[in-house]
Amino acid sequence: MRCFSYLWHTFSFERHSFATLRGYLLIMKLTHLLYTSAALAALPLAAFAQGNPSRPNLVFIMADQFRGDALDCLQQEPVQTPHLDQLASEGILFTEAVSSYPVSSPARAMLMTGMYPMANGVTGNCNSLNTPYGVELSTEAVCWSDVLKQAGYATAYIGKWHLDAPHPPYVDTYNNRGAVAWNEWCPPERRHGFDRWIAYGTYDNHLHPMYWDTLAGRDEFHYVNQWGPVYEADRAIEFIRTESVQSDRPFALVVSMNPPHTGYELVPDKYKRLYDSLDVEALARQKPYIPEKGTPEGDYFRANIRNYYACITGVDEQVGRIVQALKDCGLFENTLLVFTSDHGVCMGGHGVEGKNVFYEEAMRIPMICCWKGRLHPQRSDLPVAFADLYPTLLSLMGRKAEIPSTVQTHDWSRYFLQEQIQTPEDAFQPYYYCEPSDPTSGRRGIRTARYTYVVDVQKGKVTQTWLYDRTTDPGQLHNVAESQPARCDSLRQTLIQWLGKTHDPFVKYLTH
């Protein structure tokens, strides 16, 4: 009743191939839209009912820079996440989920397109340094949101987007006034099927965030004196309550929260106080990959970890509010609910403050998928990648036939439906790092259940190889590439086959 009472009162490949890539994507998108229009017209009217399990709602909540171990139920980090723990008990908690390119724009582009970086063109972060190289989400790509929009879903995107290239004159926000511009407006024609829009490109002042609303022009953004995740959860709950009375259509909602991204200190005091007594030195001693006190990265960890956990607990509380809104409105059982993150963060570990590396703290992400009555609650070590959620979720939602042929990432839906998920022994995930300004340089790798194998290439020449045995060396402290050449050769062949299969031109640097 709370839901309806509220509504009664409140209706509120390389650079030269870029043009070819755009043309190909445009052809595929037009073909796809024609196909799905015909398929949609053939559906019986009964299929459009809000409660029809063949047309479930989708609520996709993602944080930014949220480490895979940072859930209290995993007992790996001293962090408080009661709402996510509860959600994990009601759904599938994937303990080995990863981000294949652990940095914002590339990870998000892979999620939206189901294509790897050299295919979707987002080979680095969307900022003014990379604008000359065409680094932004293509309008011609068929995103999963395009598929759902074409299928009759009401769609909304709330929060961080970070898939548009900044162009001068830059939008007048603080993070566009330095040497590198980061923030950019996303015009309606670039929103890939999202009708409701309360978003920004990238903006890290979490206590005073800015947003563009659906009809706002480029210079018509507004600021909010509220912690970003709270504001975004408020807007998400409004959308859910409004859509709950629309019995003729399902909905797809994305809530993209920026915390626990930097700045970690920009979090309400009520969450900070929860970690005042945390013994940071004892915690650092438990993590052998954290440098000693008095080193730059060691001090970085000690200065920020309390606030990082505070951000996570704040995000957890907002997730709980959104889940409760679904339950209050009677939508929880017909909603496929996902919580995850675009990547993790090293937080000073291995001498790295940020991410964009192959260490577990950067690659591993939380992933919870809940659909009451359809997905069996359990923990699974299935190595699902952030980017795999495109085909996997659409298949679970009954839209497998509408997944475009451009999608490269893996559909795990048949495993999701198993009462006890059986992980394939040969399962692995790729790792990417690209140089947008120099396609002859970068890194490629694979992460298996036991090993992390990565090759660095500069100007077309292999310069370094890393091999970590995470079973005997979970902290990834010892590169054993030189002492295990046979293992490296085997993994190299697997990587070469993968790059060939996905038409990554980087393969030529590993085969000569």
Question: What does each model-found stretch correspond to?
Answer:
Residues 1-53:
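Bacterial Sec-dependent N-terminal signal peptides
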Residues 471:
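Conserved, charge-rich beta-strand/loop surface module that forms ligand/interface-binding patches
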